[in-house]
Amino acid sequence: LELYQQAKDAGMFLLDSPVSGGNPMAIAGTLAIMTGGDKEAFVKVKPVLACMGSPVYTGGPASGSVTKLVNNMIGGAILVAIAEGYAFAAKAGIDLQTTFEATRGGFAGGPMYDNKVPKIIKRDYTPGARIAVHRKDILNAKHYAHKLDIDTPLTDVVLHVMDWMNDNGHIDEDQAALVKYYEDKMGVKVGREETAD
């Protein structure tokens, strides 16, 4: 808010416009864009933002950044749930590809599910969205929650899993690699590496 006020005092405007959607949506120009600040300024820059995706005005200064924290808290919980679910499936001995096909049209399905589950099944942890970047956002959410004097128990679990990834040298891998935490805890290997024929 301090930077916002400095810009305003200097006769300028400042908008916070974090994005979500990862590399594929950035390339396609379909990012979710969360913009906070003066509404009039948002209206002026909306056509520029629209070149990159779908801008939504979230309210006053810093509201875009807080909205992004909400997005990443929820996204982190979904990612950890996917990792846990697929480790559970592997331990139970059911086919992961069949599980994916059977569940992707249900409540569990969605863009993140469609993006990450095939990576888990193939054990492809090439970074598209690095755990390190997401962990930074989770730490920011925890910091803000502390300022608000609130508990975030599910986000605590997400941070615990991401901290384990950091401590075990997997922090720069794709978010799909979160399954490695559950492989360690459940004593199971999830997915298969594809080999060239």
Name these PLM-found stretches:
Residues A10, M186-D197:
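Hydrophobic alpha-helical segments
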Residues L1-M73:
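Rossmann-fold dinucleotide-binding core
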Residues K44, S63-K185:
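Helical "substrate-binding/catalytic lid" subdomain
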